[in-house]
Amino acid sequence: MRHKHGYRKLGRVSEHRQALLRNLACDLIENGRIETTVPKAKELRKYVEKLITKSKNADLNTHRYVYSKLGSNERAKAATRKVIEEIAPKFENRKGGYTRIIKTRFRRGDAAEMCIIEFVGE
């Protein structure tokens, strides 16, 4: 039984899963919306919404926390700056639910259910 397991493994080992979520989070922050599979989007939603909630309090510790969660490269640095300076202030009066998942189609080839994940209000 998988009661209270807490997260999806997505068919990957932990390091690969962490890298996948970091890359998807950077893509979502940079572009505002991305298309991916439903299980990945549901995991990404939890990951990104925690970052945005933490980013509402913009201090040095927040910058370091978000940067560490998004990786340590130039892309993560730009994404950190964008989430703290642009995205988090838009959701200042919102207590959660910063993203929306819209189911779109079934992928040709493996029939995986695809969806679009985007920020609310964009």
From Swiss-Prot:
Record text on subunit structure and interactions: Part of the 50S ribosomal subunit. Contacts protein L32.
Taxonomic path: Bacteria, Pseudomonadati, Campylobacterota, Epsilonproteobacteria, Nautiliales
GO molecular function: structural constituent of ribosome
Pfam families reported for this sequence: Ribosomal_L17
Protein name: Large ribosomal subunit protein bL17
Domain of life per record: Bacteria
Keywords: Ribonucleoprotein, Ribosomal protein
Entries under InterPro entries matching the protein: Ribosomal_bL17 (IPR000456), Ribosomal_bL17_CS (IPR047859), Ribosomal_bL17_sf (IPR036373)
HAMAP family, per database record: Ribosomal_bL17 (MF_01368)
One GO CC term, this protein: cytosolic large ribosomal subunit
GO biological process: translation
Membership in a protein family: Belongs to the bacterial ribosomal protein bL17 family.
Keyword Ribosomal protein in annotation: yes
